[in-house]
């Protein structure tokens, strides 16, 4: 499965003055995927604690600071 390399490259061009190598773009994308996976896993646990079957926005909001702190660079 491929990922949107052009979109990531465009994002970095808009927000940074430097270009990135292809391997750096790969690492950024993998870190992003790991972040989303962790966020959804913790939100799912939070939903189970409250007895919900689906993950609601409030479950994500309640754990977002914890996950963001883990991924702070």
Swiss-Prot record:
Disruption phenotype: Severely perturbed cell division. Aberrant cell-wall deposits accumulate during septation alongside a range of mitotic defects including errors in chromosome segregation and spindle formation. Slow growth at 25 degrees and inviable at 32 degrees. Pfam families: CBFD_NFYB_HMF. One of its GO terms (cellular component) is kinetochore. GO terms for molecular function: protein heterodimerization activity. InterPro entries: CBFA_NFYB_domain (IPR003958), CENP-W/WIP1 (IPR052484), Histone-fold (IPR009072). Gene3D superfamilies: Histone, subunit A. GO terms for biological process: chromosome segregation; kinetochore assembly; mitotic cell cycle; mitotic sister chromatid segregation. It comes from the Eukaryota. CDD domains: HFD_CENP-W (cd13732). The keyword Nucleus applies. Residues 1-67 form the Histone-fold domain. Its main location: nucleus. Keywords: Centromere, Chromosome, Kinetochore, Nucleus. It is found in: Nucleus; Chromosome, Centromere, Kinetochore. Component of the kinetochore, a multiprotein complex that assembles on centromeric DNA and attaches chromosomes to spindle microtubules, mediating chromosome segregation and sister chromatid segregation during meiosis and mitosis. Component of the inner kinetochore constitutive centromere-associated network (CCAN), which serves as a structural platform for outer kinetochore assembly. Component of the inner kinetochore constitutive centromere-associated network (CCAN) (also known as central kinetochore Sim4 complex in fission yeast), which is composed of at least cnl2, cnp3, cnp20, fta1, fta2, fta3, fta4, fta6, fta7, mal2, mhf1, mhf2, mis6, mis15, mis17, sim4 and wip1. Belongs to the CENP-W/WIP1 family. This is Inner kinetochore subunit wip1. It comes from Schizosaccharomyces pombe (strain 972 / ATCC 24843) (Fission yeast). The lineage of its organism: Eukaryota, Fungi, Dikarya, Ascomycota, Taphrinomycotina.
